[in-house]
Amino acid sequence: YTDYYGTWHGQPTANVPKSLYDEKAQSDWTQKWFEFGTLNLPNAAYTNVAHKNGAKSIATIFYSGNDRGEQTYKDLLQGKRADGTYPVADKLVEIAKYYGFDGYFVNQESSVNSADVPAYQDFMKQIIDQGIYIQWYDSATYPNGGVSYQNMFNDANSPWVQDPNKGKISDSIFLNYWFSGNMLQDSADHAKSLGIDPKYAVFAGIEA
């Protein structure tokens, strides 16, 4: 997982607080601590290199608690249809197929209302059921939706990957960074107990 590429396709930046775009922030980018735009798409060069080397190219969907203003995960769940599907999920599938990248890294680092957790699961399942890859970040927990980094794969985050009732929700999880060797082993064991291959579904590493 890396944050350093820039999209060539534009980012949604609704409700960006103008107060943050002051003279200092504009003239000295070291002061620009905030980051707006919830959707970051990999550019064509990034995707091309990834595919040439047998790797996936995935976009990022990022919600955090301190720098997204009025942009929240609830935007993803808008307009639910009578059949229970979500228009935004279909649009994300369309975007990925059009630009030729493989899927999305869902970085939900702000709390999810517990009442919305089942809908969020259904939203992601709708995407993977159409062949688009989803990787979940070890952040919002199940079933209450609060952010609590587990640093391992366990019962608090595994339903975001494999739900006992709904089945597969996403393809993999990327663990938060404060893990140990024992935690990684426990993560692998937990994945196997769910019938998941940890080599393909449980990732850990560093942030660049």
Where are these regions (language model features)?
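Active-site clefts of carbohydrate-active enzymes
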Residues: 65, 197-208
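Chitinase-like catalytic core of GlcNAc-active glycosidases
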Residues: 1-186
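Long, acidic/polar, low-complexity amphipathic helices and coiled-coil-like
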Residues: 187-193, 197-201
